């Protein structure tokens, strides 16, 4: 059985994160419970970015000087580091500016292939009568691009529905049929924390000959993720959720699929040859990486992945599982607080959204902030899911590898005061 961190290990871990020493408006150290929105960065990541700019900054794949060669090596090494972390191959990693762009890359490639009458048949080309399937639990980033694709191509958009607690209902898998070309869904909901039944969904998709795209933004920093074991065709990743910098994400795709996808952005760096009349393009992944790339951010993300690997993803998952159960138990003892998501007895991670009776989420967030507890408020880019729960918005607390029981205790204590603060009981 995987062991949780000892108090000494957790203390050493927290010492790597300079921002955890910040004191908030209330005069206490900030209890950061907003890992689902963005993660904090260890000094190893901060130093990697700073050192790159101090010693190695150069353009990638342009020139033969030392700085350019060092930058190119770091840029390409980043592919290998991410590929090793997720169980893929380096030539299957496409750099994007974030996970949203990675999803749009697939959607726009499908659009380009489908609207080009001269395009060769390919697995990403849509035909009359086809459909795309998502779920009601999706972040807007994995909903709106498919709405746009379907509107542009006349394709039907379908979705899997949910149990009352927000988990995907496998009884609705029948919406995936022989005309489904792609099933796109989240590995973990950014509202409920529920882990999706990947095996069941992938199995049904395979029966029907559909491709599968997995959004790992809420899973890849909190549990082991192996794209080949999961059996998907595409997966998207976000650096800033994984202790890395903003401005960099990635698409992983099976090599045989990437090679059949048309480019989305065009320009420098992705061409083989250009004449005044036409152009030819590089093979994947370079075909999808037009223009100058965020090299320093890739260096920082590489350092973050090595940091996570050094801790061990299974250990992080166990630490967060224990804290999630502890948090849910604490919330259950507070009257008037409704958790939007499954209980600790279901497969879930430490993303806990909740509604406080009679109190707006922004007011909840301000009360918590006054006691130096950082949480997220709003609809979390998941309006349809909030409508499913019958609310417009919620407050969300989310844990990470540096979260402590003491921070959870502070959160529960402050949350218990919210309703009385606004005149409730």
Predicted regions and their residues:
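Pyridoxal 5′-phosphate
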Residues: 1-425
């Amino acid at each position: 059985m995987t062991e949780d961190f000892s108090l000494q290990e957790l203390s050493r871990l927290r010492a790597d994160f300079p921002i955890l020493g910040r004191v908030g408006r209330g005069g206490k150290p900030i209890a950061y419970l907003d890992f689902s929105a963005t993660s904090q960065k260890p000094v190893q990541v901060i130093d990697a970015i700073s050192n790159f700019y101090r010693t190695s900054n150069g353009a990638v794949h342009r020139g033969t000087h030392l700085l350019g060669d060092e930058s190119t090596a770091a840029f390409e090494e980043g592919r290998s580091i991410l590929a090793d972390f997720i169980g893929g191959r380096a030539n299957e990693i496409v750099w994007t500016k974030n996970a949203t762009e990675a999803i749009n890359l697939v959607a726009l490639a499908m659009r380009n292939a489908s609207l080009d009458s001269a395009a060769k048949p390919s697995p990403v080309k849509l035909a009359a009568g086809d459909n795309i399937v998502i779920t009601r639990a999706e972040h807007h980033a994995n909903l709106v691009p498919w709405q746009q694709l379907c509107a542009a191509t006349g394709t039907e958009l379908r979705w899997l529905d949910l149990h009352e607690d927000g988990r995907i209902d496998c009884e609705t898998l029948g919406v995936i049929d022989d005309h489904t070309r792609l099933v796109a869904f989240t590995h973990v909901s950014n509202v409920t924390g529920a882990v999706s039944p990947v095996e069941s969904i992938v199995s049904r998709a395979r029966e029907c000959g559909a491709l599968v795209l997995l959004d790992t933004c809420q899973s890849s920093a909190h549990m082991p993720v192996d794209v080949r074991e999961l059996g998907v065709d595409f997966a998207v990743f976000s650096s800033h959720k994984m202790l890395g910098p903003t401005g960099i994400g990635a698409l992983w795709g099976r090599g045989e699929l990437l090679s059949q996808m048309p480019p989305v952005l065009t320009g420098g760096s992705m061409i083989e040859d250009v004449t005044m009349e036409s152009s030819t393009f590089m093979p994947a992944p370079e075909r999808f990486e037009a223009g100058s790339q965020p090299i320093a951010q890739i260096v920082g993300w590489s350092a973050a992945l090595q940091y996570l690997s050094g801790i061990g993803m299974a250990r992080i998952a166990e630490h967060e599982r224990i804290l999630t159960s502890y948090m849910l138990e604490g919330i259950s003892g507070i009257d008037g607080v409704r958790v939007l998501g499954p209980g600790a007895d279901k497969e879930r991670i430490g993303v806990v959204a909740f509604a406080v009776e009679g109190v707006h989420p922004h007011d909840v967030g301000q009360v918590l902030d006054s006691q130096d507890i950082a949480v997220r408020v709003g609809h979390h880019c998941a309006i349809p899911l909030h409508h499913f729960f019958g609310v417009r918005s919620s407050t969300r607390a989310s844990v990470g590898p540096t979260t402590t029981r003491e921070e959870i205790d502070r959160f529960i204590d402050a949350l218990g005061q919210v309703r009385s603060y606004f005149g409730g009981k």
